[in-house]
């Protein structure tokens, strides 16, 4: 298999599962963590390696692997790889081209790059995609019973770092505080997206593309991150998917469903500890961006605007140029600006053109 973004949280766990399942790693790519990819090269001995920045080539130790550089290099690497499975864990819209290239080459796509579906779900062959996400894995598992007819799909949110912060103090919070997730430790982007509830807006759009636009789609807060998804059926019964909060579960099924079903990758649940489970609505007063949920479901191509404005805001927030209130304001202004526009793009280039337009419009925000 090919692992793109092998030095991130998803990539590292994917390599653990691949090793456990005896899956050969043909190719790896990374962003900036050259020291770690050098270690991975020693262990997995890939035939091909890609790095984003040519300035990192001097520190790369490929051990005879063919080396590719930049996003174009990743495309070329995918083109040349014989593997049938590509796991895309690149962060941000930078991973979009890799998703397209993988599907163009008729490869199965294990997709952790949310931005691919959020920005261009209408252009991707969903039948070849397995999402690497606890919530969507939960929905997939719940929908395997074809006798029951689903009515609504519900995914859970932890509430993020500011779920108990006094409302009047949320706007002045900085990135350091946003990165203090109460339940888990992952990358900075997804942790901040959890605090803003953008991550759940992304997952709502992913659910739309993956499981069908005809069903009602919603989310709720479940603080323990044990209930990942629920499905309500036409008979008014509801089934929930519970599991330890560990990404190795969806990763293992994306790599090899048969082996995953026979080999546990996560800890068993302590059922006696489940009495604390409680469901809460997502408050629009606390999570002001949640008010755009219905707008995005009505016009899912707005996902391009959501993602582009979020990446602009994220960079400014992490660079301490703006506080959390400014972060929210950039995304709100972008969605309000484009809310009534009709998008008819049918190519990747058109998606990237709108992405660039949104970034250019908000890059000088202060």
Curated annotation (Swiss-Prot):
HAMAP family linked to this entry: DXP_reductoisom
Annotated EC: 1.1.1.267
Residues reported to bind NADPH: 7-10, 31-33, 113, 115, 187
A Pfam family matched in the record: DXP_reductoisom
Cofactor: Mg(2+); Mn(2+)
Reaction(s) catalysed (UniProt annotation): 2-C-methyl-D-erythritol 4-phosphate + NADP(+) = 1-deoxy-D-xylulose 5-phosphate + NADPH + H(+)
Organism the protein comes from: Helicobacter pylori (strain G27)
Family per similarity comment: Belongs to the DXR family.
GO BP annotations listed: isopentenyl diphosphate biosynthetic process, methylerythritol 4-phosphate pathway involved in terpenoid biosynthetic process
Function summary: Catalyzes the NADPH-dependent rearrangement and reduction of 1-deoxy-D-xylulose-5-phosphate (DXP) to 2-C-methyl-D-erythritol 4-phosphate (MEP).
Protein name (database record): 1-deoxy-D-xylulose 5-phosphate reductoisomerase
A GO term, aspect molecular function: 1-deoxy-D-xylulose-5-phosphate reductoisomerase activity
